[in-house]
Amino acid sequence: MARQEAGQGSPSGGQPTLWAISDLHTGHTGNKPVAESLHPSSPDDWLIVAGDVAERTDEIRWTLDLLRRRFAKVIWVPGNHELWTTSRDPMQIFGRARYDYLVNMCDEMGVVTPEHPFPLWTERGGPATIVPMFLLYDYTFLPQGAMSKAEGLAIARQRNVVATDEFLLSPEPYHTREAWCRDRLASTRARLEQLDWMTPTVLVNHFPMVREPCDALFYPEFSLWCGTIKTADWHTRYNAVCSVYGHLHIPRTTWYDDVRFEEVSVGYPREWRRRKPYSWLRQVLPDPRYAPGYLNDFGGHFVITPEMRAQAAQFRERLRQRQSR
């Protein structure tokens, strides 16, 4: 794959820029060259890596080390895939111990994590406090027809939509993933409350901070594993100029309450080969101020072909029929 210079199709002009990317999934054949193609546009560029780098700890280390040697600062938050413990992983550690191991690994490489002091971006588009967060999810993004986690999971199982997290993402020492989420919410909120409210923030979380992006999911039941309603007002409460996330594999730009939300995922080869973006890296700061027509009808950074529209319509019809049974 050709070298991907940061800023292609954007007005960075070789000046310091804050970029973001997520869901590199470098353990998948075809995605490692994507990571290898990423380069800054200036020596002072920063890069946000919003989770799902890989699943094996050695592959996570390889990817973050590669990026840290190229960018002036790398800021990482975990996705659900980093927290999986698979039989192929050289480190058989689980739950919070696994997260702590990854934080220590990043610390050794000079990569910023949710456990470090929040870095302050003072270049173009700043000042802005970059807030990397690890919040997980609590099953409150319920699918239609559900009033509780149990009902939501029952609907999801009936429709054969069950996240692999249920088998590979251990919450230990917590009893449940939602208990871990509650703890992370409390500790993160306490740190956010200490920020200077006059300084804008860039909120970074693997999962979307609001429910609305999940409306674009082909399988709406998957929303159960996509976030928490407890963060619905954080982008306004904590003075965000941008909220960066991934997870959904629906890369696009949207606005909620006049705050820009950037879903910056690469996704799996079978996905991005159909709708390869103009640039792998997404500009966060300064505000890219997209030109009219740059974003497609859904906020995506790629051209929608007639074939794509036809395939999407066919898929949604099959989905409607499945849900009506």
Whereabouts are the PLM-identified features?
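Metal-dependent catalytic neighborhoods of phosphoester/phosphodiester hydrolases
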Residues: 30-34, 53-69, 81-109, 122-125, ...
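Short amphipathic alpha-helices and their capping/turn segments at secondary-structure boundaries
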Residues: 62-68, 113-125, 147-149, 186-199
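Short, solvent-exposed loop/turn segments at secondary-structure junctions
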Residues: 25-26, 54, 81-83, 120-121, ...
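N-terminal active-site segment of His-dependent metallophosphoesterases
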Residues: 1-76, 82-87, 174
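Beta-strand-turn-beta hairpins that frame and shape the catalytic cleft
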Residues: 9-19, 118-132, 200, 255-260
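Active-site-proximal loop/helix segment associated with metal-binding centers of metalloenzymes
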Residues: 129-202, 209-218, 313, 317-323
